[in-house]
Regions:
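Active-site catalytic microenvironments in core metabolic enzymes, especially phosphate/sugar-handling
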Residues: 1-263
Length: 263
C-alpha cells in the first residue's frame, strides 16, 4: 500500500511530507490534537524530552541589549513553560583591542577599549541553535561577537511523549468511555476492569503508547488512553488506573487537521 501511494504521488508530481515521532513529541502535535478532541485543559507533557535544551550567553553593549534580546526571542529563545521572553541580564565591562583591518563598533584601532556591556543569558531548544546564532550575528553590533553555548540537563517540559490534562467536570467511567468511543468513531474499545472512580484527570498518547503507563500512573491520572496496549500490559494495575485502547489509526486520525491548518 505504501509503495503504491509513493509511486502514484511521484507520477502526479505530488510532494510527500512525512512526520512521525517529531510530530508526536511536538507542542501542538498529535497528542495535543487528541486532548483537544477530548476537551482537556491544563495540559502537561507526560515524559519531557531530555538533553534537548542549551543555554546561550552573549555580551552586548548596553545601548544594543534590547535589540539583541528581541532578536533572540524572535528566533526561539527564552521560552520556559507558559512564559516567554525569559532571560537573565547582568551589567559589566568588556575589554578588547581592535587590530589593523578591523572596523570596530566602538573604540580606536590599536588601543585597549573598555565598554559597558550586558551579559545576556537565555535558553533554547538545541535544534534551534543554528537559527539563533544566525539571528545573533545579524543583529549584534560587534564584528566578532562573544557568545558561549552550554548543554543543559534540564528536561524540556514543552516537548516529549504523551499528555496529561483535566476535564472541565468529572464523568463516570462509563460516560467517559462512551464519549471516547463516539468521538474517535471506534466500533469497539478495550479497557481493563473499571476502578469505580470518576474521571477528571486524563493521560493519553497517540499510537502505541503503553510504555508511558508508569508515567500516567505517577501523574495521578484517572484514565490512560492510547492506540495500542499489549495483552500483558493490562495486568498488575488493577484499581490503579483505568486503561483504554482505541486503536492506533483511530487515535491519530485527526492529525491531518494539524496539517490542514498549516497549509
Amino acid at each position: 500500500y505504501v509503495e503504491r501511494c509513493m509511486l502514484k504521488a511521484i507520477k502526479n508530481d505530488i510532494v510527500i511530507y512525512s512526520a512521525h515521532t517529531n510530530l508526536d513529541n511536538a507542542q501542538g502535535g498529535v497528542n495535543y490534537k487528541i486532548a483537544e478532541k477530548i476537551g482537556l485543559k491544563n495540559l502537561k507533557v507526560l515524559e519531557p524530552k531530555e538533553n534537548s535544551l542549551i543555554k546561550l550567553v552573549t555580551f552586548v553593549p548596553n545601548t544594543k541589549a534590547d535589540a539583541v534580546r528581541e532578536a533572540l526571542f524572535a528566533a526561539g529563545c527564552g521560552n520556559i513553560g507558559n512564559y516567554d521572553s525569559c532571560s537573565y541580564n547582568l551589567e559589566g565591562e568588556g575589554t578588547f583591542r581592535a587590530k589593523e583591518g578591523t572596523h570596530p563598533f566602538c573604540g580606536a584601532i590599536g588601543e585597549l577599549h573598555r565598554e559597558g556591556e550586558v551579559r545576556i543569558e537565555t535558553i533554547l531548544p538545541a535544534f534551534k541553535k543554528s537559527a539563533v546564532v544566525r539571528a545573533l550575528l545579524a543583529v549584534h553590533p560587534y564584528e566578532e561577537p562573544a557568545f558561549d553555548i552550554y548543554p543543559l540537563q534540564n528536561d524540556w517540559t514543552q516537548a516529549g511523549s504523551g499528555i496529561v490534562g483535566e476535564l472541565d467536570k468529572s464523568e463516570t467511567e462509563l460516560e467517559f468511555l462512551k464519549r471516547i468511543k463516539k468521538t474517535f468513531e471506534v466500533g469497539c474499545l478495550r479497557h481493563n476492569k473499571l476502578t469505580g472512580r470518576e474521571i477528571r484527570k486524563v493521560a493519553l498518547c497517540g499510537g502505541a503508547g503503553a510504555f508511558l503507563l508508569p508515567q500516567a500512573i505517577r501523574s495521578g491520572a484517572d484514565v490512560f488512553i492510547t492506540g495500542e496496549i499489549k495483552y500483558h500490559d493490562y495486568f498488575g494495575h488493577e484499581g490503579e488506573i483505568l486503561m483504554t485502547e482505541i486503536g492506533h489509526y483511530e487515535s491519530e486520525q485527526y492529525t491531518k487537521e494539524i496539517f490542514y491548518s498549516i497549509i
